[in-house]
From Swiss-Prot:
Family: Belongs to the bacterial ribosomal protein bL27 family.
Gene Ontology BP terms: translation
Keywords for this protein: Ribonucleoprotein, Ribosomal protein
GO CC terms in record: cytosolic large ribosomal subunit
Domain of life: Bacteria
Protein known as: Large ribosomal subunit protein bL27
HAMAP family: Ribosomal_bL27
């Protein structure tokens, strides 16, 4: 005879993988056209000059230059300063 009753099935044991969101290029780093600067859900960061916004709200560089973060009226903007102006 069995000395233990049958164990019930557990409802745990699942977890989703991380989505790798966040800032990919930080202030002062070089960016080239098409480089992803931020992966995000919603607009935590807004696109500024020379920065585009994808349909999943990812921000990417439109021109080559240096990444520059700026806060304006409680909104965070990301700009790209072109290489010509950086010299």
């Amino acid at each position: 005879m069995a000395h233990k009753k049958a164990g019930g099935s557990t409802r745990n044991g699942r977890d989703s993988i991380g989505k790798r969101l966040g800032v990919k290029l930080f202030g002062g780093q070089k960016a080239y056209p098409g480089n992803i600067i931020v992966r995000q859900r919603g607009t935590k960061f807004h696109p500024g000059k020379n920065v585009g916004c994808g349909k999943d709200y990812s921000l990417y560089a439109l021109k080559s230059g240096i990444v520059f973060f700026k806060k304006k009226k409680n909104k965070k903007f990301i700009n790209i300063i072109p290489k010509i102006l950086c010299k």
